Amino acid sequence: MTDEPQSDEQQTTEQERPLGTKRATRADGLRRPGVRSGLAERRSPAADSVRNGAAAVRRFLLRDVFALGLMIAALVIVILFFTLLGATKPTSSGTGIPLSQVFTLARDRAIVEATLLDEDARVQVHTRDGAEYWAAYPSSGAQTATLSSALERGGAIVAVKQQPGKAQVTIVVQFLLPILLLVCLFALFMRIGQDGGAGGIASFSNFTGRGRKKGKGTAHRVTFADIAGVPEAVAELAEIRDYLDDPSRYLDLGAAAPKGVLLVGPPGTGKTLLAKAVAGEADAAFFSLSGSDFVESLVGVGAARVRDLFAKARRMSPAIIFIDEFDAAGRKRGAGIGQGNDEREQTLNQLLVEMDGFSGDGGLVVMGATNRPDILDPALLRPGRFDRQITVDTPDVHGRSEILRLHGSKRPMAPDADLDEIARLTPGFSGAELANVVNEAALLTVRGGRREISQKLLEESIDRVVAGPAKKHLLTERERWIISIHESSHAVVTEAMGTGATARKVSIVARGRSLGTAAHMLTDRDQTIMEEPDLVMQLIAMLAGAAGERIEFGHLSTGVHDDLHEATSLARSMVTSFGMSDELGPVTIGEKSGEVFLGASLQDLGAVGPKTLDLIDDAVERLVKDAELVARAILRINIDAVHETAHALLEHETLSGVALEAVLSTVTTVEPEHFPELRERERGSARDRDA
């Protein structure tokens, strides 16, 4: 390998370099001469801020001729000020002495000639020995006459120098030029502030978000081709794009395009990405900002920014205004407990007026994105403002497969990588989480020095996204056996119920706060509606770990905490939300309150009496205990499979694929209709053991 730097065609960036390859280095371990070190590229943040600010001001001045003229005028005033400043200084030559000494020299007849400077209020004297002095005297007429008389009595020749024009120059330098300079600077700062880009006095009340003029953006824009898994949302937004491109198709039929489109969905489902795609495809101006940008510490700033934003958008019509995290600006009015001012309400009121004012906005579309539509003000959601609400939910198994293919197409995938199986392994994942799975797999590929992303690394990345990286801390043999029994019980019970959800991986490797995992693979179709038997089987599977520990050791460990918490929460939902209890019947208890200040997330149990609360607790306890009894009965039938799986886990730590199928092949299947019989049998056995 030579020490010569590579040519431009040979050099590649980190993004272009294939996965698993390393940056080229010299044989002695040093970088090539053409590569700068990280230390050489470090710059001061303060210097960068000053440099960026200066560049912004320079671009603004070149764009605004009036501001450039103000800047030139200010420079001329400064130059003129320093030029005339010397002319206003008092004229003085010789040595300065007190005025009393001048009177003494005059009495001694030592002064030959004296000159009175009228504007400077100074006297210059020449003595008989050739010395030259000056002294300041009061500029009143009486003092001047007294000094002149004393000099004449001393035999000096007295002259008065008028200094014409010096008073006017002094006024110009001391008063006029500073005022003109302040006026120019004030006008310049106001001009910069109104532009909104370089900062300034008016920038508080101006729209400061991101925007671009009419056009389809740069070559790196986001389009609908970059979106997968949400075909319904894409179809709805494509209609908005078509209207902005050719409104005549809709106007000929008397159809009016929606004034506002609200994207609603959980975090990470692609709401912001959809807005970027509309901006990338529509031939319209695009303005983007966050709902929190409207709220400032200064009262009235939010409303002013709303007015400025809509004014700019109307001037550049057709235009799209996108407000991310819309709930920050559109929260319900009138319920702000402890609210110190009505700044948020002023902002919302101005937004309501702008979206449905007296003037028609034919080419203006407002898009908002939020994951909390329940706290938005109802006035925003009525037709005429946000006419259309588009729900962007987590993708189903087919949508997940499309999203994984979209991200996988940008990376080298190994032949064994099955993205359809990864889609089945990730129920409930959002688009952002799926992108993170593929990215984690790519990072693991680079870490292992490989060139392609394999199926094993994709499955490992799922575990990393769900539970975190694996921990390498040491456990005692007793602790490892407890965890093995716990996770094996989950896998065996899930396999025995035969619901179509089979265990795909069991591990005793600790991740995050979990000491082990028993992941399950769903069928090729996500279940949309859950029936009561489905939820009961979920309860049984959740409590299988606790049941296995109770059978094997006669007591529970702290490792069942998360399982008990999830099972209790599910049982309470079955009783209070789904009406699946004999004690209360088909009723819903604990509607969510509408307190906006509290986030509308607390249950309102004020109208529920203590007797009903006791019934709820009894029903929840019955569901949980019955589910554990069934889990114990299933485990007693398949206790040999539990032990075989646990011993395999102690040896290999993780079981999946063929190895897991082998240890679970002896599991006896139990049909749901036999659950009541198993429950009563286990309850009777428990009574016999207690007796």
Swiss-Prot record:
Top-level taxon: Bacteria
Pfam families, per database record: AAA, AAA_lid_3, Peptidase_M41
CDD domains: RecA-like_FtsH
GO biological process per UniProt: protein catabolic process; proteolysis
EC number: 3.4.24.-
Sites where the protein binds Zn(2+): H486, H490, D563
Region feature Disordered, mapped onto this chain: 1-48
Chief location: membrane
Compositionally skewed regions (Basic and acidic residues) per UniProt: 14-31
Catalytic residues of the enzyme: E487
GO molecular function, one term: ATP-dependent peptidase activity
GO cellular component, one term: plasma membrane
Cofactor note as given: Binds 1 zinc ion per subunit.
Binding site for ATP: G265, P266, P267, G268, T269, G270, K271, T272
TM spans (from-to): 65-85, 169-189
Cofactor names: Zn(2+)
Family: In the central section; belongs to the AAA ATPase family.
Subunit structure comment from the entry: Homohexamer.
Protein name, UniProt field: ATP-dependent zinc metalloprotease FtsH 2
Biological source species: Conexibacter woesei (strain DSM 14684 / CCUG 47730 / CIP 108061 / JCM 11494 / NBRC 100937 / ID131577)
